[in-house]
């Protein structure tokens, strides 16, 4: 497991030949990509946004789970969008961190059979500093979850 920090735009990450990439973000369970990085996902991937919203409205008990969607431009980008259900806006930062751990463990299982890019022998998940915006979780708390996951490596994109 490695957490690597990259200065730049998450959406410029490109797939190695023959592989797909994962762009992950923390999501609410209400079906709204309305603010923060989620709003950027909604503008960039309106079809995936509709799929996410429909999924949320048809399902319950989503906290601690993940939803993997193909990006609208999957044929070109080979990008999957990982929706990590970490909050419904009623959780403490500690609860959000717990749900982050659970959702990433589920994501790791979902990715096992897919041709996802690797580094250091692990599949890679690309993300911003999840939970640290609207959900208000100190980044160090989420980072601790990433550090202990043995099955995935993380590229965390930061913008100055």
Swiss-Prot record:
Q: Which Pfam families match?
A: Macro (PF01661)
Cite the entry's keywords alphabetically.
Hydrolase, Protein phosphatase
Which catalysed reactions does the entry list for this protein? ADP-alpha-D-ribose 1''-phosphate + H2O = ADP-D-ribose + phosphate
PROSITE patterns linked: MACRO
Protein origin, superkingdom: Eukaryota
Enzyme Commission numbers on file:
3.1.3.84, 3.2.2.-
Q: Which GO terms describe its biological process?
A: peptidyl-glutamate ADP-deribosylation
Q: Please give one Gene Ontology molecular function term for this protein.
A: ADP-ribosyl-[dinitrogen reductase] hydrolase activity
All copies of domain Macro, residue ranges: 1-160
SMART domains from the entry?
A: A1pp
**Which residues of the sequence carry a binding annotation for substrate?**
8-10, 26-28, 33-38, 130-136
Q: Which PANTHER family does the record cross-reference, listed alphabetically?
A: ADP-RIBOSE GLYCOHYDROLASE OARD1, PROTEIN C6ORF130
What is the recorded function of this protein according to its Swiss-Prot or TrEMBL entry? Highly specific phosphatase involved in the metabolism of ADP-ribose 1''-phosphate (Appr1p) which is produced as a consequence of tRNA splicing. Removes ADP-ribose from glutamate residues in proteins bearing a single ADP-ribose moiety. Inactive towards proteins bearing poly-ADP-ribose.
Q: Which family does it belong to?
A: Belongs to the POA1 family.
Q: What is this protein called?
A: ADP-ribose 1''-phosphate phosphatase
